């Protein structure tokens, strides 16, 4: 028996062995109910997280803790969310289309006018489809992309097959270090998985070191508790403590900026080695990982560039949005492939989102018909791609440098909110 617990940023499909109809009944009784016209009690599948709900889940844990070990997973799942978070509980199998429709509902249900929000969401999808084919993996469910039979696999990157290469490892499409546990690329051989994992993907993980520490995202290797001048502690009650050591010069600058702007801004230093261009290459590798095997041919020059066998110059800038107005527990990967004859648009665009940072970037190919250095290029992209709107905070960043950086410097800004914002 499978019970689906659906949130807007996560879908958990928990399988319960044996015949546990009583357990299922108790789980469904967590949800609101009503009497139909014939007087029969009907249970809805939708509700919101609340104190009462958590109390009832604790009772279910106490009742079934010796019989249904999965009950602890259910409680841990709900503890991740704040009160008021919408969710569905649906028993049995659920299709990808149903999952997407329910997710659209969850994303918009708390909006002032959810119907209008869902309408706008569909309009955005329609606008994108006029220029691009849109492919996305949201990380809500575990997916394996590419040939399932290991004996028939051909690596999408090096084009080698067995017995020349092996496919024994689990190749995560986007690094575990960025929170991915669910999106897998079958057709990435062990040799390429290791090479990318210790190369461009390692640089990308290093570049996002502070975000990984702040959100306690653990990959294969343990995280340190801080940087050169700060330490981060995740307390047992769910809070985050940050201790920062400032030099005399930094203290003077902090006090001066505080008087002028009224904001609290602390410099953070992390000793991490990375090459900016490798961050860009890793982002491209992530989005290529969600394509079907048959869609890879146009991106051979991209792979050659990722592997250092081809120079693509100039490289376009990358659009970065941080923070976003949402938080993702699972990374979300999207790639758009041009279907129209609009020569003013790039052939392919990638979008990578995790925690509360988003990247929108051109997937570079050698024979693209657009000029990557054209200053108007991103303005044209904004018209075709409503996801990218400079006015909501996207900024363009240059990741073209192949010079190794030994330190990451960033700022931690605190903005005082009004009492009305806290209500």
Question: What are the residue ranges of the model-derived segments?
Answer:
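Short flanking/linker segments adjacent to small metal-binding domains or redox-active Cys/His motifs
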Residues: 232-259
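Histidine-centered nuclease catalytic patch
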Residues: 161-185, 200-202
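C-terminal, charged low-complexity interaction regions
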Residues: 10-11, 20-23, 28-73, 261-423
């Amino acid at each position: 028996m499978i019970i689906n617990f659906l949130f807007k940023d996560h879908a958990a499909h928990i399988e319960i062995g044996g015949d546990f109809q009583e357990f299922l009944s108790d789980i469904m009784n967590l949800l609101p109910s009503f009497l139909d016209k014939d007087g029969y009690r009907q249970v809805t599948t939708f509700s919101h997280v609340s104190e009462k709900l958590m109390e009832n889940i604790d009772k279910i844990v106490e009742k079934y803790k010796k019989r249904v070990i999965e009950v602890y997973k259910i409680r841990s799942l709900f503890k991740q969310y704040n009160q008021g978070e919408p969710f569905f509980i649906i028993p049995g199998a659920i299709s990808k289309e149903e999952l997407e429709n329910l997710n659209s509902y969850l994303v918009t249900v708390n909006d002032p006018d959810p119907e209008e929000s869902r309408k706008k969401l569909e309009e955005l999808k329609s606008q994108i489809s006029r220029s691009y084919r849109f492919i996305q993996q949201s990380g809500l469910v575990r997916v394996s992309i590419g040939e399932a039979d290991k004996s028939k696999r051909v690596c999408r990157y090096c084009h080698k097959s067995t017995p020349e290469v092996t496919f024994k490892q689990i190749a995560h499409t986007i690094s575990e270090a960025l929170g991915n546990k669910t999106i897998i690329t079958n057709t990435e051989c062990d040799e390429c998985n290791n090479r990318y994992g210790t190369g461009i993907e390692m640089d990308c993980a290093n570049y996002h070191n502070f975000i990984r520490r702040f959100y306690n995202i653990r990959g294969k290797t343990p995280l340190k508790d801080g940087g050169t001048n700060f330490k981060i502690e995740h307390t047992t009650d769910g809070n985050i403590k940050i201790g920062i050591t400032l030099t005399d010069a930094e203290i003077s600058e902090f006090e001066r900026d505080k008087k002028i702007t009224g904001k609290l801004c602390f410099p953070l230093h992390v000793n991490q080695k990375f090459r900016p261009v490798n961050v860009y290459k890793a982002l491209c590798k992530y989005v290529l990982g969600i394509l079907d095997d048959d869609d890879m041919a146009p991106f051979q020059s991209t792979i050659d560039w990722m592997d250092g066998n081809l120079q693509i110059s100039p490289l376009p800038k990358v659009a970065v949005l941080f923070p976003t107005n949402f938080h993702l527990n699972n990374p979300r990967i999207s790639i758009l492939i041009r279907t129209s004859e609009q020569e003013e648009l790039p052939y392919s665009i990638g979008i990578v989102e995790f925690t509360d940072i988003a990247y929108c970037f051109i997937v570079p190919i050698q024979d693209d018909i657009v000029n990557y250095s054209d200053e108007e290029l991103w303005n044209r992209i904004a018209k075709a791609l409503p996801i990218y709107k400079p006015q909501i905070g996207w900024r363009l960043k240059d990741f073209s440098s192949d010079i190794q950086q030994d330190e990451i410097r960033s700022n931690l800004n605190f903005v005082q909110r009004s009492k009305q914002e806290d209500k």
